[in-house]
């Protein structure tokens, strides 16, 4: 089966709220995370900043897992700029440079319809090219908060994960409730109106992935954790049959006690795969800490591992390759 891995980049002002995102060493650095993640897949290190994206405690971006899987299985990667502050310095498809707004103050993405339409065209062209399966990953700091807002607006009681072991659920709840007050809705208030939920609370990554999924009629693997649950919920709300979709994530997301991945996936009605990666024996603390709940997923790590497994490699092979890449990074 001919598969293509897409990495969709997105930013939202929500990532600038202190304490909400650890997908960058500081809130300000989250602006650089999506392009830097994309660049690291192609170069030894990013061009846009002189280091790979890390959490404030120094844990490496999950892009290292995606890069490892790709070095093993050699699948093609296409970078898509859904809507970011900065363009990546790698070849990419430009959908928009629109960044999601802070939904506490204003609608997050009034341009959602326009982004979906453009991404849909790209999905249609990819279908014409003979590709049978899209595996779509994302890099979107703050995206678990926009995802949780969407799920709640659509009436799903889901709790999304976080790249931190201390999932800021209380802060997320306050931020979302403020957004709901601004929009004049309550929990489940936009049930049956996916597009309005996306306009009010979403981010450009979600709109791009929705458009790609509508335009491409083959199999789609939504390669992300709880953020892709929001995408699946929107697609379901738009009347899309989810039987050709699957979510591929990592076991760290599935095992996250502070989130509700399996329960919410079941409610939405989408099947899932969890990459069985294990860094507990790693010689590097930055990787061992994934087992303590740091990072968990992103940049399509679960989906990339799934492609490597389909190509005959084991999760252990991916882990070994990650170690090798990490050693290179810190030497």
UniProtKB/Swiss-Prot annotation:
GO function term, MF aspect, one: nicotinate-nucleotide-dimethylbenzimidazole phosphoribosyltransferase activity
A Pfam family per the record: DBI_PRT
Organism superkingdom: Archaea
CDD domains: DMB-PRT_CobT
Family the entry assigns: Belongs to the UPF0284 family.
Protein name, as recorded: UPF0284 protein PF0303
Protein source organism: Pyrococcus furiosus (strain ATCC 43587 / DSM 3638 / JCM 8422 / Vc1)
């Amino acid at each position: 089966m001919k598969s293509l891995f897409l990495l969709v980049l997105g930013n939202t002002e929500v990532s600038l709220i202190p304490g909400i995102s650890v997908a960058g060493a500081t809130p300000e650095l989250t602006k650089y995370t999506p392009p830097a993640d994309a660049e690291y897949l192609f170069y030894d290190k990013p061009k846009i900043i002189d280091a790979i994206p890390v959490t404030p405690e120094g844990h490496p971006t999950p892009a290292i897992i995606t890069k490892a899987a790709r070095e093993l299985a050699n699948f093609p990667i296409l970078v898509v700029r859904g809507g970011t502050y900065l363009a990546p310095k790698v070849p990419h498809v430009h959908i928009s440079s629109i960044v999601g707004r802070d939904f506490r103050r204003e609608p997050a993405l009034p341009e959602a319809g326009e982004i979906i339409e453009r991404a849909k065209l790209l999905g249609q062209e990819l279908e014409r090219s003979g590709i049978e399966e899209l595996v779509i990953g994302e890099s979107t700091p703050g995206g678990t908060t926009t995802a949780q807002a969407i799920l709640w607006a659509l009436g799903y009681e889901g709790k999304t994960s976080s790249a931190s072991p201390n999932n800021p659920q209380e802060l997320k709840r306050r931020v979302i409730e403020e957004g709901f007050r601004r929009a004049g809705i309550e929990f489940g208030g936009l049930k049956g109106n996916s597009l309005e939920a996306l306009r009010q609370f979403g981010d450009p990554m979600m709109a791009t992935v929705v458009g790609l999924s509508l335009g491409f009629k083959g199999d789609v693997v939504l390669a992300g954790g709880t953020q892709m649950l929001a995408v699946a919920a929107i697609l379901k709300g738009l009347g899309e049959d989810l039987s050709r979709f699957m979510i591929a994530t990592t076991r760290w997301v599935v095992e996250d006690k502070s989130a509700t991945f399996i329960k919410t996936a079941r409610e939405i009605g989408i099947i899932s795969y969890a990459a069985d990666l294990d860094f507990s024996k790693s010689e590097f603390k930055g990787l061992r800490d994934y087992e303590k709940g740091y990072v968990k997923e992103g940049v399509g790590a679960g989906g990339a591992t799934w492609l490597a497994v389909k190509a005959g490699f084991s999760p252990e092979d991916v882990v070994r390759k990650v170690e090798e890449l990490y050693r290179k990074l810190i030497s």
